């Protein structure tokens, strides 16, 4: 057993080698403060897939005992991974997957388990560093890690100053959340979101982002060099591995180029994935038949290689893309708003052959998503939700729609990060759902655009519209081309997927995944400002659509906030919450109470119920002893048909509250008094103090009255 202790900004790391998980290809115990993680790497050397796909699985698992807790729920055992665990697994996967060589198709598993958590450490950063170290010292034959280690870093910002590797407390007060991973001078993965402050949405300018990125890059260079020097003695000898032979059969390639260039070019121009796949599949069988070649897989490899070569040559040499666009061109955009009559807000956003139907639903505090974090002692509430769905028919495939996958969770999280800071009404519960109806690249960014407009379509106030665009990259030798608004083909055959979302003032969220094994900051800078041009172009189109929005006023929930004396809040709640529950049931509203300030927020499906609840609450707290009297009322003693003479308690626009003989109040609705809506009840009953009433209906504490003629 050997220990290595390393000190970095806000990190005090200890790596233990030859101590745990020694049967694995690579295993280490990682500690930062009171947080302890186990990272292991395993591969099946005898099981190699014939497919080109790398069968790599990454699992980040939190053990509840790590923070002296029991698993919540009926079954007291860890089960289905939480959203945070899935997103952390994706973060590790997206960093480490590009490091595996072409042709490495052994089943490989990376597992990171949290065994102890002090409530302060950044578990995502800890998990990535632990996994990267376990992979580095393993016997997997990765040339990319021969002389370079991998590190992650999180950058926060407060009062204009950057914070490297902020604690969870510092991050909660930060204006920025930027996570970067890389090795030496190369960047592997970026995730970023702006955080709303008291001053507003706090979108980050491109210049400020590059400053933060430079800070991250300098940290990564220093950290990875230190890791390489310290970990190298513990690195195992790699097992034998024959890398994929990139050399193609020149004779077969010449045949394809000479005789089948035109049909391949035609297939490229079919921008729908299903059509292109069908045409290329038929062409492969045609070549096998006409050239009398038995190895169909070999033919497929050569046709796909030639197709990729054509796509990249068109971009690098002619600056023309497969669909005829220039490098900076955005696909045609069309937008329709509120096409769903009974959704609070809806938008159909179409960009080229990518289409997203985004709906928005507004709710109250009871609609918020309850969730737990490993470091939280009580349940937390999530009031802004974004759910992204990618049905198979969107790419022309026939398969069952099942449970939500990691990709859908990741795309939904990206869209949520992009939009959340722009929402001004943070107290409301808002759910956005993006249904991808057709996909040919950049569906997550279409969801961002549609989601921003869907918020406006249901009357939610936003700081600014948010647009998203996906950027691509094609490189060869010294040549480099950056693509705006990439299609599915360009994503597949390109070298980078770089998603940027934001408004006119700057960036609200970003995600970058690289396939090259690293990218320079110069290329990233160029892509960033090219994305800004596209974003502003898209925002102009979205502004035109926003100006034409017609709200679904009839179905939109209504809300109002008003103040009462803070010490009266307890009267609204009642013993065991009885009073507030009765008000909610009686008037069909949702109520949020702020004990310290005395703020009461009432939401209802219509104005009438809202005003009834507000009037009732104000009346409840206006006189001493009301609360006790209200709670003692025997509501079941009131029977339909009972008549009595009652004192008028209050006259409001929608009716008259009358004191009931055995406590409590009943309501005579205006419709039971007059059909003339122009008449004011206060004028009709100006000199009347008592009324002869009859009970028309009684439901719990809701008593409806009528006048006895």
From Swiss-Prot:
UniProt catalytic activity: RNA(n+1) + phosphate = RNA(n) + a ribonucleoside 5'-diphosphate
EC numbers on record: 2.7.7.8
NCBIfam families listed in its UniProt record: polynuc_phos, PRK11824.1
Domain KH, residue spans: 557-617
GO biological process: mRNA catabolic process; RNA processing
Listed cofactors: Mg(2+)
Protein name: Polyribonucleotide nucleotidyltransferase
GO cellular component, one term: cytosol
SMART domains the UniProt entry points to: KH, S1
Subcellular locations according to the entry: Cytoplasm
One of the record's GO molecular function terms: polyribonucleotide nucleotidyltransferase activity
EC class name: transferase
Keywords, comma-separated and alphabetical: Cytoplasm, Magnesium, Metal-binding, Nucleotidyltransferase, RNA-binding, Transferase
Domain S1 motif: 641-709
Family stated for the protein in its record: Belongs to the polyribonucleotide nucleotidyltransferase family.
UniProt organism field: Helicobacter hepaticus (strain ATCC 51449 / 3B1)
């Amino acid at each position: 057993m050997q220990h290595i202790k390393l000190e970095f900004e806000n990190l005090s790391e200890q790596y233990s080698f030859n101590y745990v998980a020694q049967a694995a290809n690579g295993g280490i115990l990682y500690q930062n403060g009171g947080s302890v993680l186990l990272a292991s790497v395993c591969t099946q050397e005898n099981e190699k897939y014939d497919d080109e796909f790398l069968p790599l699985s990454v699992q980040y698992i939190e053990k509840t005992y790590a923070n002296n807790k029991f698993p919540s729920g009926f079954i007291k055992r860890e089960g289905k991974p939480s959203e945070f665990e899935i997103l952390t697994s994706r973060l590790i996967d997206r960093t480490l997957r590009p490091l595996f060589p072409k042709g490495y198709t052994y089943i490989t598993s990376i597992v990171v388990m949290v065994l102890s958590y002090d409530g302060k450490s950044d578990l995502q950063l800890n998990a990535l560093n632990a996994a990267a170290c376990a992979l580095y010292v393993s016997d997997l034959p990765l040339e990319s890690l021969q002389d370079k280690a991998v590190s992650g870093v999180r950058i926060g910002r407060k009062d204009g100053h950057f914070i490297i590797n902020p604690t969870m407390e510092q991050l909660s007060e930060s204006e920025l959340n930027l996570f970067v991973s890389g090795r030496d001078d190369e960047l592997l993965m970026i995730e970023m979101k702006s955080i709303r402050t008291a001053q507003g949405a706090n979108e980050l300018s491109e210049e400020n982002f590059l400053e933060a990125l430079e800070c991250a890059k300098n940290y990564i260079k220093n950290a990875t060099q230190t890791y390489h020097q310290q970990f190298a003695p513990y690195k195992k000898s790699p097992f034998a591995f024959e890398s994929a032979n990139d050399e193609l059969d020149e004779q077969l390639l010449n045949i394809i180029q000479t005789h089948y260039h035109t049909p391949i070019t035609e297939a490229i121009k079919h921008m729908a994935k299903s059509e292109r796949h069908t045409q290329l599949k038929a062409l492969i069988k045609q070549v096998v038949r006409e050239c009398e070649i038995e190895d169909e897989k070999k033919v497929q490899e050569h046709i796909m290689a030639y197709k990729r070569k054509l796509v990249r040559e068109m971009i690098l040499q002619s600056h023309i893309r497969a669909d005829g666009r220039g490098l900076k061109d955005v696909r045609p955009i069309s937008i329709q708003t509120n096409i769903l009559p009974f959704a609070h807000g809806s938008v159909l956003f179409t960009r080229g052959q990518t289409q997203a139907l985004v709906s928005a639903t507004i709710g109250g505090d009871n609609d918020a998503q309850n969730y737990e974090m490993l470091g939280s002692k009580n349940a937390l509430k999530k009031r802004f939700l974004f759910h992204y769905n990618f049905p198979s028919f969107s790419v022309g495939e026939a398969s069952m729609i099942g449970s939500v996958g990691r990709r859908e969770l990741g795309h939904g999280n990206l869209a949520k990060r992009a939009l959340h800071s722009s929402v001004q009404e943070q107290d409301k519960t808002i759910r956005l759902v993006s249904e991808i109806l057709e996909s040919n690249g950049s569906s997550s960014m279409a969801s961002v655009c549609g989601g921003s407009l869907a918020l406006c379509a249901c009357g939610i106030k936003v700081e600014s519209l948010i647009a998203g665009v996906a950027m691509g990259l094609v490189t060869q030798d010294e040549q480099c081309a950056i693509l705006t608004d990439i299609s599915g083909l360009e994503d597949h055959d390109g070298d980078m997927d770089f998603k940027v979302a934001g408004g006119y003032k700057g960036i609200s969220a970003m995600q970058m995944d690289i396939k090259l094994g690293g990218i320079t900051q110069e290329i990233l800078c160029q892509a960033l400002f090219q994305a800004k041009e596209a974003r502003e172009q898209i925002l102009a189109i979205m502004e035109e659509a926003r100006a034409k929005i017609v709200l679904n006023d009839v179905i939109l929930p209504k809300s109002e906030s008003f103040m009462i004396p803070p010490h009266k809040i307890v009267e609204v709640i009642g013993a065991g919450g009885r009073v507030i529950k009765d008000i909610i049931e009686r008037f069909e509203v949702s109520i949020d109470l702020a004990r310290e300030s005395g703020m009461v927020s009432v939401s209802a499906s219509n104005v009438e119920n809202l005003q009834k609840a507000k009037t009732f609450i104000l009346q409840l707290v206006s006189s001493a002893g009301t609360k006790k009297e209200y709670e003692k009322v025997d509501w079941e003693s009131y029977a339909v048909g009972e008549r009595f003479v009652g004192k008028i308690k209050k006259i409001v626009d929608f009716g008259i509250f009358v004191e009931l003989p055995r406590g409590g109040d009943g309501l005579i609705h205006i419709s039971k008094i007059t059909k003339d809506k122009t008449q004011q009840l206060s004028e009709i009953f100006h000199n009347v103090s008592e009324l002869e009433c009859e009970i028309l209906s009684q439901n719990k504490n809701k008593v409806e009255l009528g006048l006895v003629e």
